[in-house]
A protein has these predicted regions:
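Short amphipathic alpha-helix with an adjacent loop that forms part of the alpha/beta core around
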Residues: 38-45
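N-terminal beta1-alpha1 ligand-phosphate binding loop
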Residues: 2-27
């Protein structure tokens, strides 16, 4: 099955999750591609499309919303999934798609209903932020 994971990341943590999914998938060999590099992507050739996106300062990248808007009809005809990477998912009460506020806002804003939805706790890498 031809499969792709398209991801949006800021510090690389979402990309690491995508690579982990790809290396641990027994049924699929995913192509893993940054949302920044999909300008000429022929998305209709894939049977399974996964979109992974991280939250930065409370928001997804605008490219994530643009992607869903541009490809929603194709996504709905394919096997698809969406996962969010965000820090609040570290809290038990926000660790499920049904209780994660970022996923709920995303679903409402895009009016897309992915066939599978996941949420992963994000990483806050304080030492690399160079506050001082």
């Amino acid at each position: 099955m031809r499969s792709i994971i398209i991801y949006s990341t800021t510090d690389g943590h979402t990309k690491k999750i995508c690579d982990f999914i790809n290396s641990n998938s027994s049924r699929n060999n995913f192509e893993v591609l940054s949302i920044n590099k999909i300008s000429n992507l022929e998305i209709e050739k894939y049977e399974l499309i996964v979109l992974g996106a991280s939250i930065r300062y409370g928001k997804y990248s605008p490219l994530v919303f643009k992607f869903v808007k541009n490809y929603k009809k194709i996504l709905n005809k394919k096997k698809n999934a969406f996962f969010s990477v965000n820090v609040v998912a570290r809290k038990t009460e926000k660790s499920l798609p049904e209780t994660n506020p970022y996923i709920q806002k995303f679903l409402k804003k895009t009016n897309w209903v992915p066939k599978k939805i996941g949420v992963f706790a994000g990483k806050v890498d304080y030492p690399n932020y160079n506050f001082i």
